[in-house]
Amino acid sequence: MAKAKGARIIITLECTECRTNPAQRSPGVSRYTTTKNRRTTTGRLELKKFCRYCNKHTIHREIK
C-alpha cells in the first residue's frame, strides 16, 4: 500500500517592507523557511519576524 501524503509542507516567508519600499536602499530581502500544516492552516501564513535589512521586527508573509 502507498503511504499517504504528509500534511506538512515547507514554505518561505518574505519581509513585506523590503519588498514594497523601493526608496529604501537595502542589500536584499529577508526570507525565512518554515513548515506549516496544510490541513489546519489553509490560508497564507503571516508572522512577525526580525528583518536584518530593515533592522527591526516586520511582518513576513508566505510566498509561493
Swiss-Prot record:
InterPro entries for the chain: Ribosomal_bL33, Ribosomal_bL33_CS, Ribosomal_bL33_sf, Ribosomal_zn-bd
Gene Ontology molecular-function annotations: structural constituent of ribosome
Keyword Ribosomal protein annotated: yes
One Pfam family matching this protein: Ribosomal_L33
GO biological process: translation
Entry keywords, A to Z: Ribonucleoprotein, Ribosomal protein
HAMAP family tied to this protein: Ribosomal_bL33
Family classification: Belongs to the bacterial ribosomal protein bL33 family.
Protein name: Large ribosomal subunit protein bL33
Source species of the chain: Thermosynechococcus vestitus (strain NIES-2133 / IAM M-273 / BP-1)
Lineage: Bacteria, Bacillati, Cyanobacteriota, Cyanophyceae, Acaryochloridales
Gene behind the chain: rpmG
